């Protein structure tokens, strides 16, 4: 029995990145042998075991043969005769197919070290085309390693295009699509993930709502980049500078979906696009089983971002109504995230990247002032039920009116 460290742990060590998970491959062993050593078996499709002390994953060396459609359409063989080279060959990219022995020796049959040096994301063999999930994985790696200068090999991008046009992407489960997308949104360059999906023809299949934004113009005065799809990716890029929250970055991604529904004869104006986008956001979230936290923030941002952009002009009662509609009193953190999404929206425009966006701070300070209003004096005056709520709103409006007088722009 031989054990090798494989995959992402070896790759990240070589890239001098922090190693999160360590996965091992076990050569010439049986499930019974590992169970006797105290390992716990998990997974039904192929033999994976959890180390009793470290919790690391140990998988028996295996080969895979395509027998059906989609990411799970494989038949696995984990016999004693499967070699390390055969096990590494089934992996997606050369940089993920390097193994390390307990003595530190690197085993690199598919030239992953060379591709690390040249910053290339390259498939190992044409078997790459058998697994549609690899389109999303490569796009995610392109986003994750973009800052390091990694690029997708042209021939690998060609295979990704072939996969996109083959119909195989239709067999991916919603959960896997969202898992890869969520992980991509957590990288430093999530916009690259969506750009790669577009470059290989996968975006219209997986995210038709986002694909539909490309080619939709906005007024040049406010959007020098003009194209709404380009603007969307710029906003996603800006989102990274403001928050690492998944819900926040997703809301930035989908804030303008409604612009795709504007009749062409009304272009480049998009009046009411925020509310128009709500159904598209809900459809996308239903289809990919996206968490409610992401959906809720995304819908609020879509519906209210154009109003927030006019925050400096809003009367006190409009500001309090905005806070009421967004449940800011009970969910101040979400309200703050919503305002910051509008910062990303403003800065996600050509030439506006470094420009101030005072509206968010202005509204947030108004909210903090309104929050200080004490309900107890209202209750002591004898108001009850809905009257308390109405009087509290009036008191908050008065406090914001005073704030506006002191901070008039």
Swiss-Prot record:
Transmembrane segments: none
Keyword list, A-Z: ATP-binding, Hydrolase, Magnesium, Metal-binding, Multifunctional enzyme, Nickel, Nucleotide-binding, Nucleotidyltransferase, RNA repair, RNA-binding, Transferase, tRNA processing
MF term (GO), any: CCA tRNA nucleotidyltransferase activity
Residues reported to bind ATP: 8, 11, 91, 137, 140
Cofactor note: Magnesium is required for nucleotidyltransferase activity. Nickel for phosphatase activity.
Residue positions binding Mg(2+): 21, 23
Names of the cofactor(s): Mg(2+); Ni(2+)
Gene3D superfamilies per UniProt: Beta Polymerase, domain 2, cca-adding enzyme, domain 2
Its EC number(s): 2.7.7.72, 3.1.3.-, 3.1.4.-
Residue ranges occupied by any HD domain in the UniProt entry: 228-329
Domain of life: Bacteria
CDD domains reported in the protein's UniProt record: HDc, NT_ClassII-CCAase
GO biological process entries: RNA repair; tRNA 3'-terminal CCA addition
Annotated binding of CTP, by residue: 8, 11, 91, 137, 140
Cross-referenced PROSITE patterns: HD
Family: Belongs to the tRNA nucleotidyltransferase/poly(A) polymerase family. Bacterial CCA-adding enzyme type 1 subfamily.
Comment field on protein domains: Comprises two domains: an N-terminal domain containing the nucleotidyltransferase activity and a C-terminal HD domain associated with both phosphodiesterase and phosphatase activities.
Subunit (UniProt): Monomer. Can also form homodimers and oligomers.
Other comments on record: A single active site specifically recognizes both ATP and CTP and is responsible for their addition.
Function of the molecule: Catalyzes the addition and repair of the essential 3'-terminal CCA sequence in tRNAs without using a nucleic acid template. Adds these three nucleotides in the order of C, C, and A to the tRNA nucleotide-73, using CTP and ATP as substrates and producing inorganic pyrophosphate. tRNA 3'-terminal CCA addition is required both for tRNA processing and repair. Also involved in tRNA surveillance by mediating tandem CCA addition to generate a CCACCA at the 3' terminus of unstable tRNAs. While stable tRNAs receive only 3'-terminal CCA, unstable tRNAs are marked with CCACCA and rapidly degraded.
HAMAP family assigned: CCA_bact_type1 (MF_01261), CCA_bact_type2 (MF_01262)
Record's protein name: Multifunctional CCA protein
């Amino acid at each position: 029995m031989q054990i090798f460290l494989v995959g992402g742990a070896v790759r990240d060590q070589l890239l001098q990145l922090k190693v999160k998970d360590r996965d091992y491959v076990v050569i010439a062993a049986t499930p019974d042998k590992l169970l006797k050593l105290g390992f716990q078996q998990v997974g039904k499709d192929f033999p994976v075991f959890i180390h009793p002390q470290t919790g690391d994953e140990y998988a028996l060396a295996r080969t895979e043969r395509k027998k059906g459609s989609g990411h799970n359409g494989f038949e696995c063989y984990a016999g004693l005769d499967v070699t390390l080279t055969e096990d590494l060959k089934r992996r997606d990219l050369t940089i993920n197919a390097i193994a390390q022995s307990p003595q530190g020796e690197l085993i690199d049959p598919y030239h992953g070290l060379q591709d690390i040096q040249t910053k290339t994301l390259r498939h190992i063999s044409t078997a790459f085309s058998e697994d549609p999930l690899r389109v999303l994985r490569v796009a995610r790696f392109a986003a994750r390693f973009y800052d390091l200068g990694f690029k997708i090999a042209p021939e690998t991008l060609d295979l990704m295009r072939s996969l996109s046009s083959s119909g195989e992407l239709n067999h991916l489960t919603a959960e896997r699509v969202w898992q890869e997308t969520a992980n991509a949104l957590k990288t430093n360059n999530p916009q690259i993930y969506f750009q790669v999906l577009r470059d290989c023809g996968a975006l219209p299949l997986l995210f038709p709502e986002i694909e539909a934004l490309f080619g939709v113009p906005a007024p040049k005065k406010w959007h020098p980049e003009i194209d709404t799809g380009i603007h969307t990716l710029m906003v996603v890029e800006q989102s990274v500078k403001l928050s690492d929250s998944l819900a926040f970055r997703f809301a930035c991604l989908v804030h303008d979906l409604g612009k795709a529904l504007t009749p062409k004869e009304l272009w480049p104006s998009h009046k009411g696009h925020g509310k128009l986008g709500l159904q598209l956001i809900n459809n996308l979230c239903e289809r990919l089983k996206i968490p409610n936290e992401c959906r809720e923030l995304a819908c609020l941002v879509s519906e209210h971002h154009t109003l927030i952009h006019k925050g400096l002009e809003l009367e006190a009662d409009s500001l309090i109504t905005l806070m009421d509609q967004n449940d800011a009193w009970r969910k101040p953190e979400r309200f703050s995230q919503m305002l910051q999404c509008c910062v990303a929206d403003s800065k996600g425009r050509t030439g506006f990247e470094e420009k101030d966006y005072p509206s968010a701070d202005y509204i947030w300070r108004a909210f903090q002032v309104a929050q200080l209003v004490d309900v107890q004096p209202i209750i002591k005056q004898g108001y009850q039920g809905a009257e308390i709520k109405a009087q509290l709103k009036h008191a908050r409006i008065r406090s914001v009116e005073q704030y506006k007088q002191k901070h008039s722009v």
